Amino acid sequence: MTLYNEARANDGLGALYSAEDIYHYGSGENPYRYANVNMYSSDYIKKAYNRSDVTAEISGGNHRAHFYTNINYLRSNDVFKIGEAKHNGTNGLNIRGNVDLTLNDFITAYVNAKVSFYSRRSANGSYYWSAASTLRPNRISPLIPLSYIDANAASAWDLVANSNNIVDGKYFLAGTQSDMTNVFGDYYASGYSKATDRSFQFDAGVNIGLDKVLKGLSFHTRFSVDYSTAYI
């Protein structure tokens, strides 16, 4: 803030922050009035998050039939510790398989199939990292304790009593007249979205060699199904 005031002075402008303001921001004695928000701190971000990706493969067969199956399961969460974002996550199951058949010297057949299911949950408000790179640390305090409201401020307490966005029963969402919303408020009060993707693919075919009828002649037939759906 001192350097910011110096920069303004170099441009012929007055100081924006008083010496008293700079002292209070630096002391950290009241982080709600004199905010110093580090959006990369452990208050909001986990040190680590989990991601599991497990794959199993099964194969086998003999001279008549060969089969192969691949099963994959994916599960991951997110780095956030706040609001609905702490429940962000993805689950996915993917199964693929095929069977190749040799019925005799001139007839072969095959079956291929794939099934996948994915579900995702994410907090509404997906601009946390852009806000972290642009939001000034002293711009807002994400949450303010209810205890900071004057006991005689009846109108303020009426707002609290009728609000659905009291966090943990002791905080209300912060903001200013110039910043009436922010990513913290979105993560706590804007809810979440769930998306589901499902797909199924199947194809089967028969190949018949007709060399006994005419050299080089063959017959091929194929049947397939491709289904996909997604909804939020």
Please describe what each predicted stretch is.
Residues 41-44, 79-85, 98, 187-193, ...:
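Extracellular loop and loop/strand-boundary signature of outer-membrane beta-barrel proteins
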Residues 71-73, 78-79, 83-85, 95-96, ...:
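Outer-membrane beta-barrel domain signature
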Residues 1-22, 116-173, 228-232:
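A surface-exposed, glycine/aromatic-enriched loop/edge motif typical of exported proteins
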Residues 1-82:
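Residues embedded in well-ordered regular secondary structure
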Residues 13, 24-28, 153-154, 189, ...:
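Surface-exposed, low-hydrophobicity segments enriched in Gly/Pro/acidic/Ser residues
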Residues 46-66, 71-72, 112-114, 174-232:
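Outer-membrane beta-barrel transmembrane strands
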Residues 53, 90-96:
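Transmembrane beta-barrel architecture of outer membranes
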